[in-house]
């Protein structure tokens, strides 16, 4: 099929007209910036779970968020982008998925589950950080007591948004020289674009409110440090932008049906996700001097008390 369309096809319709070299080049360019994100997520998880477990043991949302981000990037590298930009694999891979449809039934809902879980976790990350400055004495105790309930809520909530992807038929959509996996909606109005737009828009608004409160409260602390406040503000703004970019593209697909059906929408959308998935670990590393030191084994001088506010607020 032509590269300017993306429609479901029940058979195998790989387009041999695309240059293997050029398509493979596109793939490796994307891997070149996705791979560092895998390294950062992996390094963060190793530091948090293994190397400095005692220091980060009370930051569970931090760990869960990193794990979700890591899985999403790995799925992008080894499934989503691989079968779009490596035409050599189109025919054998398409035959394999058609012969084993349960893999499509597993992959597509999982992908959307993770995309939904990510913003839910972000909501609790930002509220957790806000509570650390509003109620510094009781905040840690509160989150420890309620973590199990909140985790269960995070695990269940995405199913209220991905149910249509679970019950609908999964298909291969042949695109450029390869293909990607999508679904034929049983319930036409229940689209993932609509649901993700709602979720991510809510996250952006909640993040703006909670981080504004956090920054306002920090500005009234007696031993505040201007540099720390500025770093926190920039980090929060960057994290909001990371969620805002995919939310904007989801909105374009929802509010403009012609754009939502255009092949270019399917081309651009993954790059909007990249802003979030690649940007998030960078924001984590940038925002926390403690995490940055541990992740890269950087020896640093003893920090003043006021600096610990930033570390605590961004890793909570």
UniProtKB/Swiss-Prot annotation:
GO BP, one example? sensory perception of chemical stimulus
Q: Which InterPro entries match?
A: 7TM_GPCR_serpentine_rcpt_Srg, Nematode_SR-like
Q: Name one GO cellular component term.
A: membrane
User: Where are the membrane-spanning stretches?
Assistant: 28-48, 60-80, 106-126, 147-167, 186-206, 235-255, 267-287
Q: Where in the cell is it found?
A: Membrane
* Keyword Transmembrane helix among record annotations: yes
Keyword Transmembrane tagged: yes
Per UniProt, the keywords (alphabetical) are: Membrane, Transmembrane, Transmembrane helix
Where this protein primarily resides, as one coarse class? membrane
Task: Please give, as recorded in its UniProt entry, the membrane topology of this protein.
Answer: Multi-pass membrane protein
Question: Which Gene Ontology molecular-function terms are recorded?
Answer: transmembrane signaling receptor activity
Q: Which domain of life is it from?
A: Eukaryota
Kindly give the Pfam families that the UniProt entry links to this protein.
Srg
The text of the family note is: Belongs to the nematode receptor-like protein srg family.
PANTHER family per the UniProt record, alphabetical: SERPENTINE RECEPTOR CLASS GAMMA-6-RELATED, SERPENTINE RECEPTOR CLASS GAMMA-RELATED
Q: What is this protein called?
A: Serpentine receptor class gamma-8
């Amino acid at each position: 099929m032509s590269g300017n369309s993306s429609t479901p096809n029940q058979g195998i319709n790989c387009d041999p007209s695309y240059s293997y070299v050029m398509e493979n080049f596109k793939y490796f360019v994307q891997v070149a910036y996705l791979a560092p994100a895998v390294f950062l997520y992996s390094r963060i998880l190793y530091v948090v779970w293994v190397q400095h477990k005692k220091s980060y043991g009370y930051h569970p949302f931090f760990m869960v968020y990193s794990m979700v981000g890591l899985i999403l990037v790995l799925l992008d590298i080894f499934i989503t982008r691989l079968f779009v930009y490596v035409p050599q694999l189109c025919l054998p891979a398409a035959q394999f998925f058609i012969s084993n449809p349960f893999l499509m039934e597993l992959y597509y809902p999982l992908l959307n589950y993770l995309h939904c879980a990510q913003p839910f976790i972000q909501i609790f990350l930002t509220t957790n950080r806000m509570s650390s400055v509003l109620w510094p004495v009781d905040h840690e105790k509160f989150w420890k007591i309620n973590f199990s309930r909140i985790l269960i809520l995070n695990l269940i909530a995405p199913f209220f948004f991905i149910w249509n992807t679970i019950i609908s038929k999964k298909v291969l959509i042949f695109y450029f020289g390869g293909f990607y996996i999508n679904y034929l909606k049983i319930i036409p109005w229940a689209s993932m674009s609509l649901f993700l737009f709602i979720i991510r828009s809510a996250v952006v608004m909640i993040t703006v409110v909670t981080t504004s409160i956090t920054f306002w409260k920090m500005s009234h602390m007696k031993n505040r440090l201007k540099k720390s406040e500025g770093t926190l503000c920039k980090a929060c703004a960057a994290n909001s932008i990371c969620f805002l970019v995919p939310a904007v593209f989801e909105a374009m697909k929802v509010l403009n049906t012609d754009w939502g059906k255009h092949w270019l929408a399917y081309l651009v959308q993954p790059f909007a996700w990249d802003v979030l998935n690649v940007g998030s670990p960078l924001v984590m590393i940038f925002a926390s001097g403690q995490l940055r030191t541990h992740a890269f084994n950087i020896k640093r001088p003893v920090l003043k008390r006021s600096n610990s506010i930033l570390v605590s607020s961004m890793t909570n």
